[in-house]
């Protein structure tokens, strides 16, 4: 695992993170009712589903686990039977006290009465598991993606959230595409709302994030990939081709779309993550921005680049021979018009040069910290 200083984007400070309802006054007849409303407490009671969550996490005896929102402790016990150490963060003081009493017979369980979003990830590899409150799902996903030593994150979320993030609708979110070189996103299965108490208004799902053993992109290449994805998800242009043409030459864009099997009129949300990587493979020319100069000595658009810089003087001298001054002026005027067209051709030629050389494909490496490329905090994206 890579160290935290390899992360291009620093983690937010602990004091910047907290449960959104922590300090909000909530009405209720009893403290229990108020806490359930304030902290979004819907407890999963189905033991079969609980066992399925623990199984999906694929825990190892040597791997510590962090859990958010243990509730009544049913999942916590299941995790403790499979992991070396389980640290459960419960923000509700009443529940935290009850859990410590219930789980006192499990020496490898630690109950922490604190907001999970303020926790620091352990320095060693670990797994995250939790049936998390719907209201802080995005914040917890962000926390997991930014944790430099996390291996997997298995969580119960709203069904809609899980489907949007894992492409279950055939659409992909910006967050998923941005982090795909570092993490796999997997929709595991639906969880019926009737398995919770109190029964929520919507169904849930088990979703898993798994850090790739070898990143598909890393370092500067990852940053350029994120920049490309960000460009397309801005909503400017109306389709993926129009968005890409804001930065990349037309011929290279057309070749990249063909290489990835993506139609020019495609909406970005319908482009699969692996297609984004194939697009990047063809588009990535870090040393040749749009409108840049081609390499010396390369012929561009049928004209030598040096000829364009001279404005056609040498050609004019050779072509006019013994013509009088008026003929040379007329010939020069014609050459200037032609030179203007050739400059346009030259830009096309630069695109052709960029397509022919310097292609960079997805590369493996040792980096696992990775910049997840998220913008913003809580709130579904």
Swiss-Prot record:
Gene that this polypeptide is encoded by: ermE
PROSITE patterns per UniProt: RRNA_A_DIMETH, SAM_RNA_A_N6_MT
Cited InterPro entries: KsgA/Erm, rRNA_Ade_diMease-like_C, rRNA_Ade_Mease_Trfase_CS, rRNA_Ade_methylase_Trfase_N, SAM-dependent_MTases_sf
Class in the EC hierarchy, top level: transferase
Name of the protein this chain belongs to: rRNA adenine N-6-methyltransferase
Binding site for S-adenosyl-L-methionine: 42, 44, 69, 90, 115, 131
SMART domains noted in UniProt: rADc
Region (Disordered): 1-42, 282-381
Catalysed reaction equations from the record: adenosine(2085) in 23S rRNA + 2 S-adenosyl-L-methionine = N(6)-dimethyladenosine(2085) in 23S rRNA + 2 S-adenosyl-L-homocysteine + 2 H(+)
Cellular compartments per GO CC: cytosol
Family that this chain belongs to: Belongs to the class I-like SAM-binding methyltransferase superfamily. rRNA adenine N(6)-methyltransferase family.
Extent of Gly residues compositional bias: 359-381
Keyword match Amino-acid biosynthesis: no
Functional description taken from the UniProt entry: This protein produces a dimethylation of the adenine residue at position 2085 in 23S rRNA, resulting in reduced affinity between ribosomes and macrolide-lincosamide-streptogramin B antibiotics.
GO biological process, any: response to antibiotic
CDD domains: AdoMet_MTases
Lineage top rank: taxon: Bacteria
Basic and acidic residues composition bias: residue spans: 1-19, 301-358
